[in-house]
Regions:
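Extracytoplasmic catalytic/substrate-binding loops of multi-pass membrane glycan-assembly enzymes
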Residues: 151
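N-terminal accessory/pre-domain segments preceding catalytic cores
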Residues: 1-145, 157-161, 171
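Acidic/histidine-enriched alpha-helical segments
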Residues: 154
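Cysteine-centered nucleophilic/redox motifs
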Residues: 135, 165-181
Length: 181
């Protein structure tokens, strides 16, 4: 057991060094993200493992661009589901990169999830909440497509689409992925 713990610890250190180097000038953000999570010097907590999984999901560019708010939003949202779901399924469902396409990195996960639960899924049985058809139908009815409003083709953030209910097709698609995750 101690040998396994030492192996985990050395793997963690190696990964963290790689993240810090890859983040270039953004290393302080990663350190600030990881600092409150560290429980014991010689142990690896589940929260640390989830944080490392999130960092692993980031592209090289996102390691340089990501903010502390985005990382914390991604880490702290869905924690209640952690205990209920098998690890590999949890990673596939919830630990996707915060950036979906080429939109700005913004902390949207918690606010969007709460908003969708209160509106889109309010009258939907639990068994249907993971059915993408429910969200697709809601998007068709509630989000107006207007490609002319976004002449520079800069994607609107998922929360921007949620609040405006108007978007170009690409921003609507990014919103759908964010909402479904």
């Amino acid at each position: 057991d101690k040998l396994y713990g030492n192996t985990l610890q050395s793997e963690k250190k190696e990964k963290l060094v790689n993240f810090l180097v890859a983040s270039r000038g953004n290393h302080q953000t990663l350190k600030d993200f990881l600092s409150p999570i560290r429980k014991e010097k010689d142990a690896v907590s589940w929260e640390e493992i989830r944080a490392i999984w999130i960092l692993e999901s980031l592209s090289a560019k996102d390691l340089r661009d990501v903010t502390l708010d985005v990382l914390n939003d991604h880490l702290l949202t869905n924690i209640s589901d952690w205990e209920k779901i098998e690890t590999d399924l949890f990673k596939r469902m919830y630990l996707n990169p915060p950036r979906i396409a080429n939109e700005m990195l913004t902390p949207y996960k918690k606010e969007l999830r709460e908003a969708i639960e209160k509106t889109v899924y309010q009258s939907v049985p639990d068994s249907m909440k993971r059915d993408p058809k429910v969200l697709i139908e809601w998007c068709r009815k509630e989000i107006k497509i207007n490609n002319e409003l976004n002449s520079q083709q800069i994607p609107i953030s998922p929360m921007g689409v949620w609040k405006a209910r108007v978007a170009d097709e690409k921003s609507r698609d990014i919103f759908f992925v964010a909402a479904y995750r």
